[in-house]
UniProtKB/Swiss-Prot annotation:
NCBIfam families: DnaA. Residues 90-126 are annotated as: Domain II. Oligomerizes as a right-handed, spiral filament on DNA at oriC. PROSITE patterns: DNAA. Gene3D superfamilies: 1.10.1750.10, 1.10.8.60, 3.30.300.180, P-loop containing nucleotide triphosphate hydrolases (3.40.50.300). This is Chromosomal replication initiator protein DnaA. Domain I is involved in oligomerization and binding regulators, domain II is flexibile and of varying length in different bacteria, domain III forms the AAA+ region, while domain IV binds dsDNA. GO terms for biological process: DNA replication initiation; regulation of DNA replication. Transmembrane segments: none annotated. Belongs to the DnaA family. Residues 127-345 are annotated as: Domain III, AAA+ region. Keywords: ATP-binding, Cytoplasm, DNA replication, DNA-binding, Lipid-binding, Nucleotide-binding. Residues 1-90 are annotated as: Domain I, interacts with DnaA modulators. It comes from Ehrlichia chaffeensis (strain ATCC CRL-10679 / Arkansas).
Length: 464
């Protein structure tokens, strides 16, 4: 009888202690909420559940391994402090991973959670194009830095110092996506255990919004922050999306803090991403920023020659040279033109000649040869640099006016067939020597002034 009474008394004491500790935990939660604020408390600390206190060792539970590890690193010291303020006998606070639907089930489900993360991982990424490998990428002066940086990231098992993040930028169809796919394929084929997520900024935004609606935001955070390499294509599309930018910012920081690699692409440099928060633009420029410039004739010809070789067909080199010379907008359009010529030849049963290629692509060639006038260049450059169109003709030599004027002269020489005297005449009657000086000055600055180079590349795309 005495043993039974003692057992019953012991159970009552335990229940009383458990109840007291539950009250203490509720008080601590209030303090944590006040100390950290709504955002941190709601995202991380509100999901903690009190389990027990055995000999001064407090045990809490978290729903996932990721949340547990994050709290252990960032918030555990403050939790312990508050608990010791309430109960000096407490010597430690630990966290286990428990399904919150059954807080009495004290099991570590680390392996199960790892499996769930892996099973849900594939839907994070966009499909990879099997054609986009390093072997199929033609390297030339406009893209050699971007290629070398991408290759280095793929080959390294750790983030590259000075290249994290790797930020690739350039116009549409110049090879940014190709390089990002190539990084992923290289890692996959090398049997690396590194986990990769490649997706567009639009898909990142969609996944985030979906997670908010379904109240799975913690799973979203865990999945994206558990990868070894995160690659986000066309990041300019998060422009103006405040909540998406907030989550992208925190994901970026979390991965950098964990020494994980990021690869980001956009159609312009970080500093030119209008509608993107300054703190994000700053971080995008932390690592290596590599631009992919417009293709040269030699690069376009090399791309066509490689594609023809892969297709296993014979096309006269003069036809390839014709395409490379006349289709300058982007690689995607160039390859599309070649495919059209080859398809026509196969379906109709005729050989590929210079004349047949010219006929087949007549509409495309006309579009690529749209007339760019001197007046159009002057107007667009004036708008871009926020000066008056009359400043293009004036004799004023203020730097804020002279530099845009030189840029306009440079673009006039590059984008039109006008002679130097004709260009000079359209700029307030200046002589050809002034035009030559302006062109040389801009060519010199392009090599050293990345901001000016970006501006000119953007203006060129706007004018064509």
């Amino acid at each position: 009888m005495n043993d039974g009474g003692t057992g019953l008394l012991g159970d009552c004491v335990k229940e009383k202690l458990q109840s007291d500790n539950q009250v203490i935990w509720k008080d601590i939660q209030v303090k944590l909420h006040k100390f950290y604020g709504n955002a941190i408390y709601d995202s991380w600390l509100s999901v903690l559940v009190y389990i027990n206190n055995e000999g001064g060792k407090v045990l809490l539970s978290a729903p996932t391994r990721f949340i547990k590890e994050w709290i252990l690193v960032h918030y555990l010291d403050q939790i312990l402090k508050y608990w010791q303020d309430e109960d000096q006998s407490v010597c430690s606070v630990d966290i286990c991973v428990v399904n919150n639907q059954d807080t009495n089930l004290l099991v570590n489900i680390k392996d199960q959670q790892d499996k769930e993360v892996r099973n849900n991982y594939d839907h994070l990424s966009s499909p990879l194009d099997p054609r986009f490998t390093f072997d199929n990428f033609v390297v030339g002066k406009p893209n050699e830095l971007a290629f070398a940086a991408a290759r280095r990231v793929a080959e390294s098992n750790e983030p590259i110092s000075g290249s994290n993040p790797l930020f690739l930028y350039g116009g549409v169809g110049l090879g940014k996506t190709h390089l990002m796919h190539a990084i992923a394929w290289y890692i996959i084929k090398s049997s690396s255990k590194r986990k990769i997520a490649y997706l567009s900024a639009e898909k990142f935004m969609y996944q985030y919004v979906t997670a908010l609606r379904s109240k799975d935001i913690m799973l979203f955070k865990e999945q994206f922050r558990s990868v070894d390499i995160l690659m986000v294509d066309d990041v300019q599309f998060i422009s103006g999306k405040d909540s998406t930018q907030e989550e992208f910012f925190h994901t970026f920081n979390a991965l950098i803090d964990q020494n994980k690699q990021l690869v980001i692409s956009a159609d312009r440099s970080p500093s030119d991403l209008d509608g993107v928060e300054e703190r994000i633009k700053s971080r995008l420029g932390w690592g290596l920023v590599a631009d992919i410039n417009e293709t040269t004739f030699e690069l376009r010809l090399g791309i066509l020659q490689l594609k023809v070789e892969k297709m296993g067909i014979n096309i006269p080199n003069k036809v390839l040279e014709f395409l490379a010379k006349n289709i300058k907008s982007n690689i995607r359009e160039l390859e599309g033109a070649l495919n059209k010529v080859v398809a026509h030849s196969s379906l109709v049963g005729c050989s590929i000649t210079l004349d047949s290629a010219s006929d087949i692509l007549s509409d495309l060639l006309r579009a690529n040869h749209k007339s760019v006038t001197l007046e159009c260049i002057q107007r667009k450059v004036a708008e871009f640099f926020n000066i008056k169109i009359t400043d293009m003709y004036s004799t004023r030599r203020l730097r804020t006016l002279a530099r845009p004027r030189q840029v306009a002269m440079y673009l006039s020489k590059k984008l039109t067939q006008k002679s130097l005297p004709e260009i000079g005449k359209s700029f307030g009657g200046r002589d050809h020597a002034t035009v030559i000086h302006a062109v040389k000055q801009i060519e010199k600055l392009i090599d050293t002034d990345s901001k000016l180079r970006d501006d000119i590349n953007l203006l060129t795309r706007m004018l064509r």
